[in-house]
Amino acid sequence: MFGVYRVFVLLVFVSQLCNGFYLPGSYMHTYSDGDSIFAKVNSLTSIETELPFSYYSLPYCQPLEGIKKSAENLGELLMGDQIDNSAYRFRMRTNESLYLCTTSPLNEHEVKLLKQRTRELYQVNMILDNLPALRFAKQNGVTIQWTGYPVGYSPPNSNDDYIINHLKFKVLVHEYEGNVMEVIGTGEEGMGVISEADKKKALGYEIVGFEVVPCSVKYDAEKMTKLHMYDPVPSVNCPLELDKAQIIKEHERITFTYEVEFVKSETRWPSRWDAYLKMEGARVHWFSILNSLMVIFFLAGIVFVIFLRTVRRDLTKYEELDKEAQAQMNEELSGWKLVVGDVFREPEMSKLLCIMVGDGVRITGMAVVTIVFAALGFMSPASRGMLLTGMIILYLFLGIVAGYAGVRLWRTVKGTSEGWRSLSWSIACFFPGIAFVILTVLNFLLWSSNSTGAIPISLYFELLALWFCISVPLTLFGGFLGTRAEAIQFPVRTNQIPREIPERKYPSWLLVLGAGTLPFGTLFIELFFIFSSIWLGRFYYVFGFLLIVLLLLVVVCAEVSVVLTYMHLCVEDWRWWWKAFYASGSVALYVFAYSINYLVFDLQSLSGPVSAMLYIGYSLLMAIAIMLATGTIGFLTSFYFVHYLFSSVKID
């Protein structure tokens, strides 16, 4: 009992440590009074379509120097981010209201596009000093926080749409304190430490907050066209009357203006992301973890009782008998002892099993390392795309582990290393091939919609080059190491003639599929938060909780697979290899079913067949990765359990 308590205290400590250690993820910038700062704009996004589009696909004001794209990493490109410069200029600690531009009369295509983006709830995502714009809204007396602001709005009981053309910005600044320790991170500008000389020069203000209030204001277009960009205009209050708002219709000219207010804040630069990463539902996370711990300890208790009282008792009784008595006992008794000559017989499709286990080891390693680094703060949300980039890099370099695990299992099953090169190539191509097919199909859908989420052809070639130059050689090298590693020797000999398996009243696969409910019970609450982050545009930064859930999932998968394997051996079913894999891997089936449930009941606003196909495609890819990872955990645990179990049996 004391051991259980210590484990629980350790998990609490790890969670608090992971949540407390935070790296903001970018250089600290200080600005002097009057310094110009230009906002950037990311792709337009919507929770209704999940199809990102370029900001300048709509008739917005363009900067005087022209549109310039920011350098993007691999993760940003895959996520569909397209960060451009914008015309919105801010001057440090200068409160002002400025004119931007007036469009030409809207044509039919522009009106149709603006109305469509408005009704599909598209959001404009603006960034200042690497901080997304925050918007606060009240619903039923509760203040709700959003990132970005809508393209426009459609009043109820009206066929008209109105565009957001006036923005009221509030920029929170903190006076630079030279004695505050800076934090290293990885933002878009790179990585570095502020030197003492730079500290003395960097007298000024840090931007620690960026808020926006969107408005729709009807202007006299003829009068406003006489102004130039950044000319001052009177400050306005957001009108509530529709006749004072800017309607979207043909031949209308839309004037864009904005105003900015700088406000001093006590928030310091290392804490400026706290407003975005407020932990919601912490009690729900802890309830999920405690519930999972109860399941784990209950299941572990059953496992230990079975093994200590049944397995050890049988082994002790078996070893105390002489050879004649053992032979007589084998004829009289049934159970796992009777399959001693078949338990290590080569399974069907053994090559496919080795391939899936090899790739499963790689995916598991990638997930564990990524979540550990994220929990420690090395993959900050300030560094857009770094999480996905890190996962891809880890996957590529862990090819050496995949090749080693797959080939060593192949050598164990076959008794020879012959064919290891073909197996290593298959491991290198298996999951990337599945991902390539799914992403290519989805990419055609994105291309047909002119979405920025479509993967460019150049990126396809870059990914192919990374795979061929890093993943394939490392997988082959890992396979070579697997051929040189000491072979795992089976403790018993395999009979030439397979033993007949007794008929069962119900299919054994039914029990295997049902076993996935226990790992899913550990995972499903965290799945809700992850899905909400991906599909509803919310920040997910509770990696401390996710790390604990991952560790619990590993334990549950191992326990479930071992119990199912033992149950099959007890009924003289020696074909345990694939069943051990799918006993824990079947959790992927429930994850995919949950994703469909989430689509139907939580993403009711998702519209159009393209959006639904994108959602299902990405969910399917995630489920396959989960199946390979959890199946591998269960299989390897069962393999070592069976090896240990039968190594205790004395056989001539």
Curated annotation (Swiss-Prot):
Keyword Magnesium attributed: no
Protein family according to the UniProt entry: Belongs to the nonaspanin (TM9SF) (TC 9.A.2) family.
Residues annotated as signal peptide: 1-20
Record's subcellular location: Endosome membrane; Golgi apparatus membrane
Domain observations: The C-terminal KXD/E motif functions as a Golgi retention signal, certainly through the binding to the COP1 coatomer.
Lumenal side: 21-286, 384-386, 448-460, 532-541, 602-613
Domain of life from the UniProt record: Eukaryota
Gene Ontology CC annotations of this record: endosome; endosome membrane; Golgi apparatus; Golgi membrane; plant-type vacuole; plasmodesma; trans-Golgi network; vacuole
Main location: membrane
Transmembrane regions listed in the UniProt entry: 287-307, 363-383, 387-407, 427-447, 461-481, 511-531, 542-562, 581-601, 614-634
Membrane-topology descriptor: Multi-pass membrane protein
Protein name (record): Transmembrane 9 superfamily member 12
Keyword Cell inner membrane: no
UniProt short sequence motif Endoplasmic reticulum export signal, positions renumbered to this chain: 641-646
Motif annotated as Golgi retention signal, chain positions: 650-652
Membrane topology (Cytoplasmic): 308-362, 408-426, 482-510, 563-580, 635-652
Gene: TMN12
Coiled-coil residues: none
Keyword field: Endosome, Golgi apparatus, Membrane, Signal, Transmembrane, Transmembrane helix
